[in-house]
Amino acid sequence: MTEELITPVYCTGVSAQVQKKRDKELGLGRHENAIKYLGQDYETLRARCLQSGVLFQDEAFPPVSHSLGFKELGPHSSKTYGIKWKRPTELMSNPQFIVDGATRTDICQGALGDCWLLAAIASLTLNETILHRVVPYGQSFQDGYAGIFHFQLWQFGEWVDVVIDDLLPTKDGKLVFVHSAQGNEFWSALLEKAYAKVNGSYEALSGGCTSEAFEDFTGGVTEWYDLQKAPSDLYQIILKALERGSLLGCSINISDIRDLEAITFKNLVRGHAYSVTGAKQVTYQGQRVNLIRMRNPWGEVEWKGPWSDSSYEWNKVDPYEREQLRVKMEDGEFWMSFRDFIREFTKLEICNLTPDALKSRTLRNWNTTFYEGTWRRGSTAGGCRNYPATFWVNPQFKIRLEEVDDADDYDNRESGCSFLLALMQKHRRRERRFGRDMETIGFAVYQVPRELAGQPVHLKRDFFLANASRAQSEHFINLREVSNRIRLPPGEYIVVPSTFEPNKEGDFLLRFFSEKKAGTQELDDQIQANLPDEKVLSEEEIDDNFKTLFSKLAGDDMEISVKELQTILNRIISKHKDLRTNGFSLESCRSMVNLMDRDGNGKLGLVEFNILWNRIRNYLTIFRKFDLDKSGSMSAYEMRMAIEAAGFKLNKKLHELIITRYSEPDLAVDFDNFVCCLVRLETMFRFFKLLDTDLDGVVTFDLFKWLQLTMFA
C-alpha cells in the first residue's frame, strides 16, 4: 500500500507556524515526501507546459537582473553587462542533461565565487544513490522536454523539491557560471540555478564552506578538523568516511583577503575549496605510502609536488596499481601524499550522512533529534556567557545521557556518553541582499544539578551565575553552522545556543546526534497565573481617607469613567519624576475599566476603583524593584522577571509577543505599558478561568464569545 502524500496548506503568521508543525507530524518534509518549494509542483507545471506547447518560465525566479544578484552582480554592475538568459536548446543543437552518468569533470567553475558549492557537487558524483536523491531521474532535453527541471535539497530540517526553468546566464554564447568540461552537459548548471533560487540569487552563493552544500545535498552533519592539530588516526577516519559515502572537502586558510585564490609555488590555491575524492595506499620503494586524491573545481591548476600527475614517483609503483590510480592531465584532479596534505592544507570537512561514528571501529548509526528555534531582541536573544544579565533568556534544551559508549570507543580514557551538537543559523544567504549576513553563533552545555533533575523548566539567571559550563562550542564564529563532538558522564545537561552579542535576531536549527540512547526536550515555562484574591470589600471596609479621595476624583454620579480614569492616572504619574512614561492612553484605561467593572456600566464605583488603585500601587512596587539601573524604565529582560514577580509564568513565545507589543524601539518598557500589560494578562487569564468550567485547561467557545473576548479584553 503506497503512503498517502500530504499536501501542504499555505498560511501566514502564527497560523503558519501551527500548520507547519502539523505538516511535519504527518511526514511532510521527509525526502520521500518533499515540500513543494514555493508551492510549485513539478509534475503539474510540466504537464501544463506540454499541453500548451509553451516552454516553462519560472515567475518565482525570473531571468532578470535581481536573480543574478544585488551588488557585485547587481543590475548596474559591469560584471553583468551583456549577460543574456538562454536555454541550452538555444546554445546548441543537441544538449544533454547527463552524459554517461554524472562525473566529477562535469563541474567546472565559472565567474562566480562558489567553488565551495562546486566542490560539494563534485563529491556528490562519487555516490550515485546520494546524487539521484538531489538530481531526480527521468529528466532530459529530449523525451517530454518542457523547459522545466527539478532538484531536491535539504533546507534546515526538511527536504524541498525546487522547480526551475532552464534559462541560464550566458555571455557571448557561453555559460557564465558552472559548466561541464564537455560543454554539452547541463545538469550541474541547472543544479547551481536551483541552489541559487533557494538562496535568493546567484550572488548569494559567493563565498562559503563546502560543508554547507554537503549538508544541503544530504541532510547530514559536518565535522571539521584543523589539520595543524590532526588526530593520529585521521587517515583511517578519511578512509572510513569515503567507504561510507561521506562527502569531504578541504581548503587552505588565508590571513589576508589579498591572498584569496593566490596560487602557491606548488600550484595550490589559497582560500579555495577542494573536494577530497579518494584515498589509497600504494607500495613505493618497499614501503606503504598513504595517498589522497583531490579535485580543484576549476578543472585545472593542479598540485605540482610529489605524486602529481607527471611526478617521477609513479614510475616506481607497480604498473597495474599505477594504471588504477593515474588521472588525466589538467582535469583538476590529482594525488598527493597524506603527509603533504597535512602540511599544505589547513582544514578538512567531513559530512557524515547518517552520521556514522567515524572514530569507532564498529559501524553504527546515531540517534538524531532536531529542534527549531528563534533569537528575538528583548525576549530570547540574550547573547553568550559574557553577558550574564541576559544569557539566561536564550532558548534552552535538555539532553539526558543514559548509556556510556562501548569500551573499545574510549581506549584508556574515562568512560562517557558521546554526542554531537550542531547549531545552524537559517536563511542568512537569502538576507544578504538586505545587508544582513551570518551572525556569530555558538553554544554552551551545563550539567543540571541533582535538585533540578527531571524538571522541564527554563533555568533562570541565578543558575548561570552560580554554575560553570561543562562544555561549549570551540569557537563563536560567523559560519552557518558550528558543531562539536562532546563526551560527558551520564546525567542531564542543558544546551544553550546563542549569538555572541545580545539582541541579534535570527532563526536556528539545533541538532543532537548521540551514539547511544539519549532523551532530549526543549525547556520552557508552563503558562500559569497566580491571580490576586478576588475578595470584594464592602464600602464600609474601605479606608475613610480613600473615600474622601474618591469623592474628589469622581464626578457627580460618584463613578469614574474611562476618560476620568485617564486624567486621574496621568495626573498622579506626572508627579513621579523618576518614572519614564508617555502617560496612560485612553485604550489602556478602557482595558482597566473592563477588568474591574463588575456591574457592566462602563465605569468604576468606589469598591472597583479601590481594587484597581491597590493593584497599581503593587505594580509600581514591582516596577521599581526590577528597574535595576533606576533609569525610570525597565529593559525587556527586566520586564520578563517583573512579569513573573507579578504572578504570571509565561512561555518564550508569549514573552516574545509581549515585548513586541509593549516595548519601545530601544526595548525599554515604561510604567504605563507595564501596567497595561499586566492588566491585559489578568483580564485574559480571568476570562479563561471563567470559561474553563471543568478545569482541564481547554475551552471551547463560539464566534460571539471569541469576538467578545478579543474586542473587549
Curated annotation (Swiss-Prot):
Residues 542-712 are annotated as: Domain IV. GO terms for cellular component: calpain complex; cornified envelope; cytosol; lysosome; mitochondrion; plasma membrane. Keywords: Autocatalytic cleavage, Calcium, Cell membrane, Cytoplasm, Hydrolase, Membrane, Metal-binding, Phosphoprotein, Protease, Repeat, Thiol protease. Ca(2+) 1 binds at residues 109, 114. Ca(2+) 2 binds at residues 318, 323. The modification Phosphothreonine is found at residue 354. Its main location: cytoplasm. Residues 55-354 form the Calpain catalytic domain. Its cofactor is Ca(2+). Its EC number is 3.4.22.52. Coiled coil: none annotated. Binds 4 Ca(2+) ions. Residues 355-525 are annotated as: Domain III. Residues 540-575, 584-617, 614-649, 679-713 form the EF-hand domain. CDD domains: Calpain_III, CysPc, EFh_PEF_CAPN1. It catalyses: Broad endopeptidase specificity. One of its GO terms (biological process) is mammary gland involution. The active site is at residues 115, 272, 296. GO terms for molecular function: calcium ion binding; calcium-dependent cysteine-type endopeptidase activity. This is Calpain-1 catalytic subunit. The gene is Capn1.
